[in-house]
Every structure is written in C-alpha cells, then in structure tokens.
Amino acid sequence: MKDSIRHLIQQALDRLTADGVLPAGLTPAIQVENTKDKSHGDFASNIAMMLAKPAGMKPRDLAEKLIAALPADAGIAKVEIAGPGFLNFFQNSDALAQRLEAALADAQLGVHKNGPAQRVVVDLSAPNLAKEMHVGHLRSTIIGDGVARVLEFLGDTVIRQNHVGDWGTQFGMLLAYMQENPAAAESELADLEGFYRAAKKRFDESPEFADRARELVVQLQAGDAECLRLWHRFNDISLSHCQALYDRLGVKLSMADVKGESAYNDDLPQVVADLAAKGLLTEDNGAQCVFMDEFKNAEGNPLPLIVQKAGGGYLYATTDLAATRYRAGVLKADRVLYFVDQRQALHFQMVFACARLAGFVPASMELEHMGFGTMNGPDGRPFKTRDGGTVKLVQLLDEAEQRAYELVKSKNPELAEDELRRIARVVGIASVKYADLSKHRASDYSFNFDLMLSFEGNTAPYLLYAYTRVAGVFRKLGKGIDEIGGRIALVAEQEQALAAKLAQFGELLASVADKGTPHMLCSYLYDLAGLFSSFYENCPILAAEDEATRDSRLRLTALTGRTLKQGLELLGLETLERM
C-alpha cells in the first residue's frame, strides 16, 4: 500500500508542477510511514513539509493543494492534514478486506517481489574447522539463514556459501600431533575439540613441536599426499559436527553449500598477478599491498590492503578477493551479502573497493557486509563458561532444551514424556534463535535464558503460544478454513487494526530483504500476535452474534495463523499446534 500512496503523491506533484504551483525539477524521496495512532489514519507522509520551502508556501497550505491534486483511489477512504502539515491517509475498509481475501486465497499470502528477481549469494556461518562450533558462530548462521529464506520467499535465487576456515596453521598443529601420537590420536579424533586442545597445548609449550607444525603447513600447501589425506579427514569430521548442528538448528545449510578458503588456493597467485598487471600493487616492507585513497589511518597515512606477505604467503584479503571474483564470474551473482562480525567492517570495505578497482566484479553487482555485534552473557561481558572457556554451541542448545523441558512440564505435567521432549525441543531451539534474531544485528546483546523462555514479551514462547491459539480455534470448530464460506468484513476496531497489520506483511518482508535485518520481522510478528490477542478477547469468534460475523472472524483468524506460521518459518522456527 505504501508504494501505491507514493505513486498517488507523485501524480499529485506532477500535476502541481504542470500547473505552476511547484517549481520544475523537484525530485523528492517521497516518504510514507505507518502511523502509530490509528486515529491519525493508517499511513502518513511529510511531503508537504519537505517541499514547502522550495514551493514558497506554508506546509499546511501546500498540503491542502496536494490533497486536492491527489487522484481518487479505491484503496483510500480519505486524506486529512495533521499537525504542521502531515498528510494522513485512511484506508478503505472494504478495499482492505478484499486485499486480505486475496491473500487468504494465495499460497504466497499475497506477497510478491517488486522488481525483477535477483541471483543473491549469501555468505554465512563460516566456522573455522578442526574445532567445534561455539556460541560466536550462532549469529552469522541464523541471521544469514533468516535473510536467505526471506529472499527465496520473495522470488530471488539464493546461493548459500559456507566459507569455512579449512586452511591454515591450525592444521599443521593437528598434523604434528597426529604424527607424534598416532595410536592415541586415532581414538581421540571422535572428540575433535579435545584433540585440538591437546595439540594446541603442545604447540604453546614446545618450540620444537611448533616448528614441526609450521613445516607441515608448508608440506600441506605443497600438496604432500599424506598431509592432504589427514587434512581431508580432519575436515570431514569437523564438517559432520557442523552439519549435525545445522540440522538441529533447522538451518538450511548442507555439505553442498561448503566453499571454504581452500577452494580458492589455486586462484591466489593469479589474483596477485592480475592486481600487478593493473598497476595496483605497491611493495611495502617486502609485502605486496594495494593502497586506495579513501582508506587512511588516524594519522592520515594510507592504509594498506596486504595481499601477499613478504615470505610469499597469502592473507584473508587475497582469499576474499578470489571469492568475490568467483561469485561474480562463476556464480553470476547480482548481489552478495556477507554475514560477518561487525569488527570486520573495514576489511570488507577495502576488499570491496579493491575488487571494483581491479574489475573483478561488474559495477552493477551489489557487495554488502551485513555486520553483526557480539553475543554476551547476562552480565554484559563476553559469554564464557564458568572456568572462562568458550561456550560450545551444542552445550547452549542442550541447556536451552532442558530448561524448556522443565518449563513445559511444570505447566503440563500430564503430558507424555515423548510429547514433553518434542515440545521442549521446539521451544528451546526457537527461544535461542529468536532471542538473537529479535535484536538488531548490528547491536551487541546479552543472552539470558530466563528472559528468552518467558511467555511474556517479545519472545519465541509468546509467538508460539499465539499460533496455538489460532490452531485451537479451528480444533474446537472441527473444520478447516476451506470449509468456511462468507467474506471478511471489518467492523470492530480490533478487526480493523488486525487487518491493517496483516496487510503490511509483504512490505515488511521487502524491507528485511533490502536491509538484511530479521529483527524487523520479529517485531512485526510480535505486534501481530498482540493485535490478535486483543481481537480474540474483544471479538467473539465461535460465539459471534451471527454466521456472517463468525465466518468473517474465522477468516481473519486463519489469515493471522498462516501469517504467523509463515513468518516464523522464514525465521527458521518450527511451530506447534498445541503447547
């Protein structure tokens, strides 16, 4: 609806320009927002205040002329002026009801992308292999997954890329430990984290071991057959651990999506050669660097993007440049989204600028770093175990499920054990994910089990319960929505408020896809659940005064349920029919 209103305003501006009321050449960005107070309509625009000065008019006077110039539209009941010159648009209830009927009849809930579909590469998760995933890997994994799901729902072709850290010094360390303890190492490989810790301890304590580890890295990079065999083994075990967690989290990632650092090894010399051929390299203390005018340090000196060390080794920047070129040339991406820690912002700014300068990507290709903040403990400090260690992701999920089990059992002691465990799994995993997804990705946040498992506030249990209320209505009715006739009629205040929110679903998803911010979808679903609760309590559904009203409210209830379920699925959360 916002796009329709923008179009109406643009037509009014064109008419006023043609009539000489407005000067020619004005190209304002027309802003239309949802109103918070429905007594002020459904949508508001500040266009009259934006253009009052160039028009040489008072904002309210210009607002009056804009209203007079607006074309008639079946979706708008009236337009009023508010305050210093806001235009407030009131939706036509009958037209709104028709839109909701169309959404109810559509598998996509009336949501379709504006503009052509794109090929979008989503770079997400990317754990370092050879050790278990920890809580720090959660954000990239689930935020990237949520945005990828929304993009697919809107019609884009999404190519997931799990840029795992499968190359580097940690593998030399593991190889050295394997050589030193062949019998013990074979049995210890099942516990990859323990194996890694034992190898790291030797690396830190023994200079001879550390030297041997570095030499084995050189042998691995040179293609030594035995080193490569063991390297593949380490990676296979590590990736199987990752996949088990992806499956448990309900994340759409598979082995087919893995494109790790090692996949670009063969292209790294060519990346450096191509940068040299374009005259972009400068030697600095033996290292090969790219200097770009827009990047300087605090003292105003140029910052280097180092692509080759003095000893000939390559860096993350080199690999990222190779990956960017691959995504442009082979994957034919229109847009690439990198869900990587916010602390890497400067790195990606420099890599993207260098890739464009070198012609590795076409000018039309969008490169976007979707940075995120850190996940802290309840005290606001980095999330650690009691002994100061890193919290494994599997430990976090185990505790979430156990806490959810105790919560559900306390509320429903009569449920069978297997049903309790099933509900606890859904609630526990959903609570962990939603606690993260509901925060703006750029912000740090404090993880708190008590808050995230609450049935009050913007939490997964609250939304899951809202969906079960919808399911409960139809369970009590004994019929599905396909068996319900009638049409939606919006009479009560609560019906109109719920309907207006339902109609915003498509525009909301477009914003999530554009900005890479799933917290907006969480906020929308929370608001929707609250409006449904008000509707449920104030507008009798099964006990409505007549059949037409009952059927209308059942149809509104069904659309609410489908929207909640679809929204939660786009966040990667399972739903429950009863709790």
Swiss-Prot record:
Catalytic activity as recorded in UniProt: tRNA(Arg) + L-arginine + ATP = L-arginyl-tRNA(Arg) + AMP + diphosphate
Q: Annotated motif 'HIGH' region: location in the chain? A: 127-137
Q: Which GO terms describe its cellular component?
A: cytoplasm
Q: Check the record and name the SUPFAM superfamilies matching this protein.
A: Anticodon-binding domain of a subclass of class I aminoacyl-tRNA synthetases, Arginyl-tRNA synthetase (ArgRS), N-terminal 'additional' domain, Nucleotidylyl transferase
* Disulfide bridge map: none
Q: Which CDD domains does the UniProt record give?
A: ArgRS_core
Q: Provide this UniProt record's keywords sorted from A to Z.
A: Aminoacyl-tRNA synthetase, ATP-binding, Cytoplasm, Ligase, Nucleotide-binding, Protein biosynthesis
Q: Check the record and name the Gene3D superfamilies matching this protein.
A: Arginyl tRNA synthetase N-terminal domain, HUPs, Isoleucyl-tRNA Synthetase, Domain 1
Please tell me whether the keyword Aminoacyl-tRNA synthetase is annotated for this protein.
Answer: yes
Biological process, per Gene Ontology: arginyl-tRNA aminoacylation
Against InterPro entries, the record matches this protein to: aa-tRNA-synth_I_CS (IPR001412), Arg-tRNA-ligase (IPR001278), Arg-tRNA-synth_N (IPR005148), Arg-tRNA-synth_N_sf (IPR036695), ArgRS_core (IPR035684), DALR_anticod-bd (IPR008909), Rossmann-like_a/b/a_fold (IPR014729), tRNAsynth_Ia_anticodon-bd (IPR009080)
Q: What is its EC number?
A: 6.1.1.19
Localization recorded for this chain is:
Cytoplasm
The source's superkingdom equals Bacteria
**Is Translocase set as a keyword in this record?**
no
One annotated GO molecular function is: arginine-tRNA ligase activity
What PROSITE patterns does the record tag this protein with? AA_TRNA_LIGASE_I (PS00178)
Subunit structure, as described in the record = Monomer.
Instruction: Give the family this protein belongs to, as stated in its UniProt record.
Output: Belongs to the class-I aminoacyl-tRNA synthetase family.
Protein's name according to its UniProt entry: Arginine--tRNA ligase
Species this protein is from:
Ectopseudomonas mendocina (strain ymp)
- What's the name of its gene? argS
